[in-house]
Regions:
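Beta-propeller blade termini and top-face loops
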Residues: 1-167
């Protein structure tokens, strides 16, 4: 599961569910609306809102918790209208995306931590970067085929510096 808020809007939250879908609340969690039916696979492990444009959301498929009955996802999805509509944004073989980071100054610069297939070695693991809002992706970090990226943090003083953990 994943959750994110919107700066300046204390009652607006988005929630990516382990059971599937992206949900939205405008009243601090009293009522939730599914805003993604028909767009995603079994689970959402990462969700983020752009600081430079809060209408831009990214959601990554696959649970971030590793256990025996984990469900995989099918890449990354993007909304440019606060969740009213969604478009596939790539990384179809990622299986598990535990973190998505958006450059605070440019919502087209996006980083995705990809854990990959939990049950076998794969070259899909690592950290990916898109400079065009998810149209094209480049792998910028690859530890090895057994260690996927599990978390990302962007330096708030210098968005060109990113910290990643692999496991």
């Amino acid at each position: 599961a994943a959750v994110t808020g919107v700066p300046g809007k204390p009652n607006l939250f988005y929630f990516g569910a382990t059971g599937g879908g992206v949900w939205k609340t405008n009243d601090g969690g009293r009522h939730w609306e599914n805003i993604s039916d028909g767009f995603f696979g079994g689970s959402v492990g990462a969700i983020t809102v752009s600081k430079s444009d809060p209408n831009v959301l990214y959601a990554g498929g696959g649970e971030q918790t590793v256990r025996g009955n984990v469900s995989s996802g099918f890449g990354l999805w993007k909304s440019e209208d606060a969740g009213k509509s969604w478009a596939f944004a790539g990384l179809p073989k990622s299986r598990h995306i535990p973190r998505i980071i958006v450059d605070p100054n440019d919502h087209d610069i996006v980083y995705a931590a990809v854990l990959g297939d939990l049950y076998k070695p794969t070259t899909e693991r690592g950290v990916y970067k898109s400079s065009d809002g998810g149209k094209q992706w480049k792998k910028v970090l690859f530890a090895n085929e057994n260690a996927g990226a599990t978390d990302l943090v962007i330096d708030p003083n210098n968005p060109r510096v990113l910290y990643a953990s692999t496991w």
